[in-house]
């Protein structure tokens, strides 16, 4: 399978501060990669590297030709005094055709929001509108920066179900950043735990058949939500230095 984007031993520094160190990853068609890490771990910087907005100091980045990227930001800041409907907001995107807007909204089950004021949308509705905006680019790579932030568990389940559906329909790669260190999208193909470097990687634990998990999240939630069990052989001290653990290092 040909990668759309690959990073090999990428490092980024801002002044004397090393933000990313020897990070490698691959984004391939039809695959979901979830990036976890604490605040200040370098997740946003890594996303900017993937998007081509930050050039690394070291390492190699390879991209497929004219790669089309759809990006959903972590937050959307709007002037609350500015009258702006969903329709007008989406038309602000360069090269957007009016005829493409409603189909994009319908694709994310948000067609009914086309004339709604942006300021009145819930967290989940806003994420769907931003996702529709990203789809207007017909992306080969979908980058989602903390898409479930401000969304309740039921909203997360619905959003993960939608992301999985879009991934299959478009055969696009998905890079998803998550603020939750343990609860992830169950259908993620690979999880990377980042704290300036890759601390560990693996796949989510299959828990959809656990009675306790089903009781907590319901059958649909148990199908879409997974647990990622970290397996670090080290920890980071208050200065960010690596301290090796004794024993098996599971956390």
Swiss-Prot record:
Pfam families: ABC_tran. GO terms for biological process: response to zinc ion. GO terms for molecular function: ABC-type zinc transporter activity; ATP binding; ATP hydrolysis activity. GO terms for cellular component: plasma membrane. Its EC number is 7.2.2.20. Keywords: ATP-binding, Cell inner membrane, Cell membrane, Ion transport, Membrane, Nucleotide-binding, Translocase, Transport, Zinc, Zinc transport. Its main location: membrane. It is a peripheral membrane protein. Residues 5-220 form the ABC transporter domain. The keyword DNA-binding does not apply. ATP binds at residues 37-44. CDD domains: ABC_Metallic_Cations. It is found in: Cell inner membrane. The keyword Iron-sulfur does not apply. It comes from the Bacteria. PANTHER family: METAL TRANSPORT SYSTEM ATP-BINDING PROTEIN TM_0124-RELATED, ZINC IMPORT ATP-BINDING PROTEIN ZNUC. Belongs to the ABC transporter superfamily. Zinc importer (TC 3.A.1.15.5) family. The complex is composed of two ATP-binding proteins (ZnuC), two transmembrane proteins (ZnuB) and a solute-binding protein (ZnuA). Part of the ABC transporter complex ZnuABC involved in zinc import. Responsible for energy coupling to the transport system. This is Zinc import ATP-binding protein ZnuC. It comes from Salmonella typhi.
């Amino acid at each position: 399978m040909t990668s759309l984007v690959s990073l090999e031993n990428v490092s980024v520094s801002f002044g004397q501060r090393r933000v990313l160190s020897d990070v490698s990853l691959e984004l391939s068609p039809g695959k979901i990669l979830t990036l976890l890490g604490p605040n200040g771990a370098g997740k946003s910087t890594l996303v900017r590297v993937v998007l081509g907005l930050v050039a690394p100091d070291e390492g190699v980045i390879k991209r497929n030709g004219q790669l089309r990227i759809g990006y959903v930001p972590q937050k959307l800041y709007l002037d609350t005094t500015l009258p702006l409907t969903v329709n007008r907001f989406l038309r602000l995107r360069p090269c957007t055709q009016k005829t493409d807007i409603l189909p994009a909204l319908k694709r994310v089950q948000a067609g009914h929001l086309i004339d709604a004021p942006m300021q009145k949308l819930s967290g989940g509705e806003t994420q769907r509108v931003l996702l529709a905006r990203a789809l207007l680019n017909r992306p080969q790579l979908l980058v989602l920066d903390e898409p479930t932030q401000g969304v309740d568990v039921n909203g997360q389940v619905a959003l993960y179900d939608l992301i999985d559906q879009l991934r299959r329909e478009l055969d696009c790669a998905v890079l998803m950043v998550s603020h939750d260190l343990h609860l992830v999208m169950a259908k993620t193909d690979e999880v990377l735990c980042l704290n300036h470097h890759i601390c560990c990687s693996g796949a989510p634990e299959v828990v959809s058949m656990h009675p306790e998990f089903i009781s907590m999240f319901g059958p649909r939630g148990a199908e879409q939500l997974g647990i990622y069990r970290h397996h670090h052989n080290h920890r980071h001290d208050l200065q960010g230095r690596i301290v090796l653990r004794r024993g098996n290092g599971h956390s």
